[in-house]
Structures are given as structure tokens and as C-alpha cells.
Amino acid sequence: DKNKKPIWMAGFPGFTPIR
């Protein structure tokens, strides 16, 4: 899932950063 990507992916739309 794109929402499971690491926080460095937070810069991309649709991606949720993992805290």
C-alpha cells in the first residue's frame, strides 16, 4: 500500500508518512 511507504515518501501526493 502506498500509505505504508516510509516518511521520506511524504513529499508525494497521495502518500501518507509513517510516524
From Swiss-Prot:
Tissue expression remark: Expressed by the venom gland.
Tagged with keyword Hydrolase: no
UniProt-annotated location(s): Secreted
Keyword set includes Zinc: no
Keywords: Mast cell degranulation, Secreted, Toxin
Superkingdom of this protein's organism: Eukaryota
Record-level GO cellular component terms: extracellular region
Function: Shows a high potency in mast cell degranulation (is 10-fold more potent than bradykinin).
Protein family membership: Belongs to the bradykinin-related peptide family.
Additional detail: Negative results: does not provoke rat ileum muscle constriction and does not show algesic effects.
Protein known as: Protopolybiakinin-2
Organism expressing this protein natively: Protopolybia exigua
